[in-house]
Amino acid sequence: FLQAGEQLKGTTVELMKMGEPGVPTLDAFINSNLKKGEKIGFDGRVVSMDEGQLYDEIAKKHEGCIEYSVDLIDEIWTDRPPLSEKPAFDLDVKYTGKTVAEKLADIREKMVEAEADMHVVTTLDDICWTLNIRGDDSDFFPLVLSYALMDEKSYHLYIDERKLDDNIKARFAADGVVIHPYNDIYE
């Protein structure tokens, strides 16, 4: 908060130090500031379903509505750099301890215990760990931008396919990993 406090001095932006005493949560702030009939807009790709439902409840309480297909930053950040196209790379089982097939079997066991038909994976480290791959899409962590959906038979990986060489693609196919274009997760 120190840097933000310094950089916001003299602006009209008020720093809200979330988690500190007397500072409202985001939903409490919205609830107390939303006027009758107003709309709450957010990018539904980056808000959990629980948060989205909470915002919908708040909006309805104020006779308003939500708009979850809004990415205002995309509209104004015209020189935004493209997503990384750096290739993913394999990690040998001697470093990972288990094959992808073994990890998928372990996860499926946990899914059965939890009576889950589908497992949604959005954390990059979980995806990379499960698939024994790493990448260079972050300056600080060896991760690959991707999403995954897993069911009892398949593991659906949403990734820029250009990141995957033929060896990784063949290994994925053998392990039941189905590759989809990165942005298809939103379809």
Regions flagged by a language model, labelled:
Residues 1-187:
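A composition/biophysics-driven feature that prefers long, compositionally simple stretches
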